A protein has these predicted regions:
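A generic "binding-loop/recognition-motif" signal
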Residues: 30, 38, 48-49, 67, ...
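Ligand-binding loop in jelly-roll beta-barrel domains
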Residues: 81-107
Length: 136
């Protein structure tokens, strides 16, 4: 793949119900394009990678450490390494945002087979709850 490309050339992965992800990665930083479709709730979690998000469309309730805020187009969230954070889609409109991670998150790479206990727990919590129970 060329070093200059478009998102159309990257596979789309539905990594939890209603969450579509495309990932572009270098050696030390990666960028993802995320789309939330439906009533998406991402429970509290943390990871080693620093994360910067840019919301393009739609609205989210966000929690980063102890700060809670509604965010929308043009909002930027800076999430330091190992800070607990959570998100909930607001309204019916799809939410589209871009994220940059450093270091890269190996579990986001297509075909990666290694374990990621924190991601596995997030999936488990997400999949085993009723939508009415998914409170963050």
């Amino acid at each position: 793949m060329s070093q200059i490309t478009t998102w159309d050339e990257f596979p789309t992965v539905e990594y939890v119900k209603g969450v579509l992800r495309q990932t572009a990665s270098g050696e030390k930083v990666m960028v993802t394009r995320i789309v939330y479709q439906g009533s998406v709730i991402i429970p509290e979690h943390s990871h080693e990678a620093e994360q910067i998000m840019l919301v393009v469309s739609g609205r989210l309730w966000s929690k980063v450490a102890d700060e809670e805020k509604e965010v929308g187009p043009g909002s930027i969230l800076v999430i330091p390494s190992n800070w607990v954070h959570a998100f909930r889609q607001l309204g019916d409109e799809d939410v589209v945002f871009y994220e940059a991670f450093a270091p890269i998150r190996l579990e986001y790479l297509v075909g990666f087979k290694g374990p990621d206990p924190s991601l596995a727990m997030m999936h488990k919590r997400f999949d085993e709850t009723d939508e009415s129970d998914r409170k963050v």
